[in-house]
UniProtKB/Swiss-Prot annotation:
<keyword id="KW-0067">ATP-binding</keyword>
<feature type="binding site">
    <location>
        <begin position="30"/>
        <end position="37"/>
    </location>
    <ligand>
        <name>ATP</name>
    </ligand>
</feature>
<dbReference type="GO" id="GO:0006302">
    <property type="term" value="P:double-strand break repair"/>
</dbReference>
<dbReference type="GO" id="GO:0000731">
    <property type="term" value="P:DNA synthesis involved in DNA repair"/>
</dbReference>
<comment type="function">
    <text>The RecF protein is involved in DNA metabolism; it is required for DNA replication and normal SOS inducibility. RecF binds preferentially to single-stranded, linear DNA. It also seems to bind ATP.</text>
</comment>
<dbReference type="Pfam" id="PF02463">
    <property type="entry name" value="SMC_N"/>
</dbReference>
<keyword id="KW-0742">SOS response</keyword>
<protein>
    <recommendedName>
        <fullName>DNA replication and repair protein RecF</fullName>
    </recommendedName>
</protein>
<dbReference type="GO" id="GO:0009432">
    <property type="term" value="P:SOS response"/>
</dbReference>
<dbReference type="InterPro" id="IPR042174">
    <property type="entry name" value="RecF_2"/>
</dbReference>
<keyword id="KW-0547">Nucleotide-binding</keyword>
<keyword id="KW-0963">Cytoplasm</keyword>
<keyword id="KW-0227">DNA damage</keyword>
<dbReference type="GO" id="GO:0006260">
    <property type="term" value="P:DNA replication"/>
</dbReference>
<keyword id="KW-0235">DNA replication</keyword>
<dbReference type="GO" id="GO:0005524">
    <property type="term" value="F:ATP binding"/>
</dbReference>
<dbReference type="InterPro" id="IPR001238">
    <property type="entry name" value="DNA-binding_RecF"/>
</dbReference>
Length: 376
């Protein structure tokens, strides 16, 4: 799969830009702040319905504009599709496929798949659990686009349950009427159902990703492993991949009952996939706090390379996006990463200077300056 044309209107710094793209390597080169990352950010948005740089859509719309439009032509084998996303901050986004009638934005998921390497990836190893949960959930959705709906349902149910708990906490503090626990029981069941599905998908992903990540780490840093991926669940007990969804549902709902008193006191849901973490081990020790800066980079690269290999093996090779990542790496890791990604069907690279792009990544070049994109 590869993107053959990218069109942006009022996206970030671009009033309008048209960029034809080829298979193989394409590098966007220009000083920082000129708009090169905006191009690959748009491609990534098509794959995830989100940005790797900001948490909301508002910053993606050019100042003074009401909306932004991302349009891309995509080819997979003999099939070509045109995707369009309209970003409307404060209102519902819109989507179209092949100029058809409007579809839900999440209906475009799976048409474009990407694996993004960026300076922010270091947070996968050194950052908070939320960074690793996002990594897992975006990869889950790339494998199975229907999981976007499950994730959305989980967030909706969690929000409703937290609202109920906050009301109960307020009433308790002010001597009001105690809450009808049967209402909370209903929300426990809803959270347990969608939470068990999300948990099952995460566990399956980690079991599949583990050997790929270990191999990838060895490719990036020969002799530096092994690495180990372990899921730490707030539910407690055994939540291994052999557990059925029904068993996970029973564990999750039982855990909710077990902490109900504390939840009512604090007004927040204390167990569930939103409280879980992916533990990253390196040579039998936790990578967070133990791995050196270079080892942390090798680990982050290994997770992305393993993601790429997983998606590629499942039949729809993703676009590889390397956003200013080479400037963050030492010479050895830079060359190893370049050698590992160059066989990709489509590789998009951004760099401040041409010298940051390893020689093995020869291909099309675009100069990016002051919002202008010109092939060189």
């Amino acid at each position: 799969m590869h993107v053959t044309h990218l069109s942006l209107a009022d996206f970030r710094s671009y009033a309008r830009v048209e960029v034809p793209l080829d298979p193989g390597v394409t590098a966007f080169v220009g000083p920082n702040g000129q708009g090169k990352t905006n191009l690959v950010e748009a491609v990534g948005y098509l794959a995830t319905l989100g940005s790797h740089r900001v948490s909301s859509d508002a910053p993606l719309v050019r100042m003074g504009a009401e909306r932004a439009v991302i349009r891309a032509a995509v080819t997979q084998g003999e099939r070509s599709q045109l995707i369009e996303l309209e970003l409307n901050p404060g209102r519902a986004n819109r989507a179209r496929i092949n100029r058809s009638s409007q579809v839900r934005p999440r209906d475009v998921l799976g048409i474009v798949r990407t694996v993004l390497f960026a300076p922010e990836d270091l947070a996968l190893v050194k950052g908070d659990p939320g960074e690793r949960r996002r990594f897992l959930d975006e990869l889950i959705t790339a494998r199975s686009p229907r999981m976007a709906g499950v994730r959305s349902d989980y967030e909706r149910v969690l929000k409703q349950r937290n609202t109920l708990l906050k009301s109960a906490a307020m009433a308790r503090r002010h001597g009001g009427r105690s809450m009808d626990l049967s209402t909370l029981d209903v929300w426990d069941q809803h959270l347990g159902r969608v939470g068990a599905e999300l948990l099952a998908q995460r566990l399956d992903l980690i079991a599949t990703l583990q050997p790929l990540a270990d191999k990838a780490y060895g490719d990036v840093a020969p002799g530096g492993g092994p690495v180990a991926l372990e899921y730490r669940s707030s539910v407690g007990g055994d939540v291994g991949p052999a557990r059925t969804r029904d068993e996970l549902y029973e564990q999750l709902t039982a855990a909710l009952v077990g902490v109900r008193k504390q939840e009512i006191e604090r007004g927040v849901t204390l167990v569930g996939p939103h409280r879980d973490d992916l533990l990253l081990g390196l040579r039998g020790m936790p990578a967070k706090g133990y791995a050196s800066h270079g080892e942390s980079w090798s680990y982050a690269l290994a997770l992305r390379l393993a993601s790429y290999e997983l998606l590629r093996s499942e039949g729809n090779e993703p676009v590889l996006v390397l956003d200013d990542v080479f400037a963050e790496l030492d010479a050895r890791r830079r060359e190893r990463l370049a050698e590992l990604v160059v066989p990709g069907e489509q590789v998009l690279v951004t760099a401040a200077v041409a010298e940051d792009v390893p020689g093995v990544l020869a291909g099309a070049r675009y100069a990016v300056s002051a919002g202008e994109v010109a092939r060189v």
